[in-house]
């Protein structure tokens, strides 16, 4: 990354000094390529600041799925810096072009060294490498026929227990290393002695952000979306509806399932995930706001952890009093990167000299979790309840990354069960293995779930398999878990709701619906905040698939080169039959467009 920056600066100086009389076209071309390369490098630096790992699955997912509910305050300065840098880049580009005249242009091609440095600056740009690796991973065709999915029935063969999941935002096992972080998490360190602690839990691909970690640990699958086909999933009504998750299994057994989170449920689709998978009550910031003592006591992400854990403990007491099996899942927030936040109740308890903000936050949350667990473990609720303390994912780039990145990093995973003997288990495992392992403690015969395995009785698939290859071998099956709605179940467009209804399913529009050979839904594409117009996606369709496109009339007319009058807010539907080389454009309210109309249109010979 820094090598590329050095080469960019060096190539600018050398190219600037290598000007000679030559082709004005070549001058423009080399100038454009140079400044494009510089622009993409600046974008990479910003993405790296967000993720700590360059352009990865988490960055792509949030660009695709959406960022509503995003705690944006801590990113204002770096984002402003990105904008300023690119304004300067654009200004330099304009000035550079302005000075290129027919009498003073391009570099002397005999001066090989400037060209070499310039090419090296392009080839070393990590933006291209990360993007290529992601696209290659998502589009590669692996000829592996083995099905690693565990799909046998999971049922109770022992007495049912309640279950509590406490996801600790970006708190990983590495923070427990006393040689590196002495006395950083003394409470959780002490609690570990009373738990079944798994010390060797890795993060496979597509699991290292919050909703991905939740899907992996509860469903045993990575959070893949059809990125190669630019499918955002942001407008789909159900989140991995065909995945079999802990919530689905417990819901069938009449468990009362609840999720309490301090942030906006819309962020990354967390609320949709829990509602899809059997949870009766799903609450985030807006649902909890009116129950808070002080509505102004919140971080940029939502409810502070001291307030959240107090709400969770009271909810556990309430659920326990109802004499019905329950599952309660929650996620803390204070340790969110890059610097974390400090709850008022432990604001005076800084770590060491207090100069590292994220470590202060981790130290504070350790205190809050310790207080919660001290109350829970001596209560009657613990008699028939299994509690899980775990990472949602490894820490992203924060004020301690320079220390964390030098270590062998693992996820936190501890199970507290009064009927089980405390011990430490160093078996190789990954986030997929968490779900089936936990379920075995609450009475289920869970040998596996998805790509996960019960680490108490089985070896993780990580032991004998390359996980990237394993995920790719099951990619089609994983993508099918999104289960697009079917036209045969009905088709109705509501302009008022900006939705397309397929029976009891729906998607948002604008949308591009690509059909398969049976003229059923194969893919659905959306326009994420108008960042990539659907017209571009239509143009890039490589096959002769039929499709429906619902969008503003102006965009459809422009694509089809139609000169028609329309109101600025009018929406149209384009039906394009690429096999018969014909199309039809209609205002949404011009005809009764239903599933029969679509079926008849595309069945026309």
Task: Label every PLM stretch briefly.
Residues 212-223, 403-446:
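Substrate-binding rim/cap in mid-to-C-terminal beta-strand-loop elements of soluble/periplasmic
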Residues 364-403, 438-445:
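Metal-dependent active-site segment of extracytoplasmic phospho-/sulfohydrolases and closely related
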Residues 341-347, 359-382, 410-413:
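Active-site neighborhood of glycoside hydrolase catalytic domains
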Residues 1-134, 601-605:
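Transmembrane and membrane-interface helices of multi-pass
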Residues 51-61, 85-86, 90, 114, ...:
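Active-site-proximal alpha/beta segments of enzymes that process anionic O-linked groups
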Residues 215-218, 275, 331-338, 388-398, ...:
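Acidic helix/loop microenvironments that form the catalytic cleft of cell-wall polysaccharide enzymes
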Residues 12, 17-20, 265-268, 420-605:
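Membrane-interface soluble catalytic domains
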Residues 248, 310, 363, 367-371, ...:
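Feature representing long, continuous alpha-helical segments
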